[in-house]
Amino acid sequence: MSLLEQLDKNIAASGGLIVSCQPVPGSPLDKPEIVAAMALAAEQAGAVAVRIEGIDNLRVARSLVSVPIIGIIKRDLDDSPVRITPFLDDVDALAQAGAAIIAVDGTARQRPVAVEALLARIHHHHLLAMADCSSVDDGLACQRLGADIIGTTMSGYTTPDTPEEPDLPLVKALHDAGCRVIAEGRYNSPTLAAEAIRYGAWAVTVGSAITRLEHICGWYNDALKKAAS
């Protein structure tokens, strides 16, 4: 059974939750052993996969969890806005560290390495390639280039203003076009995650609402302050 077939089976049985275990940078939780513990807790709670950033975090998580890991490396480049797995060496390192799926930025922006080359390198390692996209055009272009999975990860993050709501119409449009879609980006409630499935998502990635304690506390603090004013 291929990994995609196994994931199809697990998603049908468990509902399609993927947990992104990426603490706020510099947080007290931003340590490989804590990231790995989050990943294990997510697996034990029914997540069908986890998304992990960074080689050290991935290696430790891989030693604890049995579900597939979506691996990424984030970089801040001087000459490109692309942050997610921009280099071929990043793909190689993630493959060596134990990622089953490697995600790359799939947007049509200036970049050090072409999306096509990154996807080909992932497939060279016999792993699944995921493209983090911002639009239907991005997603369809990446699908034509061989991406196995299209994520809506970058929707709302390539323009100055980020909306509060997730991009459900993008999920539907990509699904209707024949893409295997992971809905990601601002799915900060079970209701929104469930809505993504109704719109055609194959699975839904949730990050901040589960693993970023500072964000969750901020939401509660803001609501309480507003109620008290």
Curated annotation (Swiss-Prot):
<dbReference type="Pfam" id="PF04131">
    <property type="entry name" value="NanE"/>
</dbReference>
<dbReference type="InterPro" id="IPR013785">
    <property type="entry name" value="Aldolase_TIM"/>
</dbReference>
<dbReference type="GO" id="GO:0006053">
    <property type="term" value="P:N-acetylmannosamine catabolic process"/>
</dbReference>
<dbReference type="InterPro" id="IPR011060">
    <property type="entry name" value="RibuloseP-bd_barrel"/>
</dbReference>
<comment type="function">
    <text>Converts N-acetylmannosamine-6-phosphate (ManNAc-6-P) to N-acetylglucosamine-6-phosphate (GlcNAc-6-P).</text>
</comment>
<dbReference type="GO" id="GO:0047465">
    <property type="term" value="F:N-acylglucosamine-6-phosphate 2-epimerase activity"/>
</dbReference>
<protein>
    <recommendedName>
        <fullName>Putative N-acetylmannosamine-6-phosphate 2-epimerase 2</fullName>
        <ecNumber>5.1.3.9</ecNumber>
    </recommendedName>
</protein>
<dbReference type="GO" id="GO:0005829">
    <property type="term" value="C:cytosol"/>
</dbReference>
<dbReference type="GO" id="GO:0005975">
    <property type="term" value="P:carbohydrate metabolic process"/>
</dbReference>
<comment type="similarity">
    <text>Belongs to the NanE family.</text>
</comment>
<keyword id="KW-0413">Isomerase</keyword>
<keyword id="KW-0119">Carbohydrate metabolism</keyword>
<comment type="pathway">
    <text>Amino-sugar metabolism; N-acetylneuraminate degradation; D-fructose 6-phosphate from N-acetylneuraminate: step 3/5.</text>
</comment>
<dbReference type="InterPro" id="IPR007260">
    <property type="entry name" value="NanE"/>
</dbReference>
<dbReference type="GO" id="GO:0019262">
    <property type="term" value="P:N-acetylneuraminate catabolic process"/>
</dbReference>
